[in-house]
Amino acid sequence: MDVKYKKSDKSLTVYVYGELDECSASVAKNILDKLLSENLKAKRVVFDLSGISFMDSTGIGLLIGRYKKLKELKIPSFITGANFSTEKVIELAGLYSIMPKI
């Protein structure tokens, strides 16, 4: 699992690579929380999941946790780039209802 990011004037795009599951969730959580805390002036955060090879319910929980933190700060969050299998997990969990797909 790896995380990279790109900042612009208005948004922070977070690129997540590899597997997002029980084994990688705690590492991903620490990386994402640090990254988000360093970029509190972003107007929006986009999670680019095009590099995800596998995601389970632990990955969904991780994204929901980041959504809640960002919602408290009034920063909208979005998802983009999910492959077919990741998209199915996201749809089944109803995640797009709180983190829209762009």
Locations of the language-model features?
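Absolute protein N-terminus
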Residues: 1-2, 102
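STAS-typified acidic loop motif
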Residues: 4-30
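Amphipathic alpha-helical interaction surfaces in cytosolic regulatory modules
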Residues: 22-99
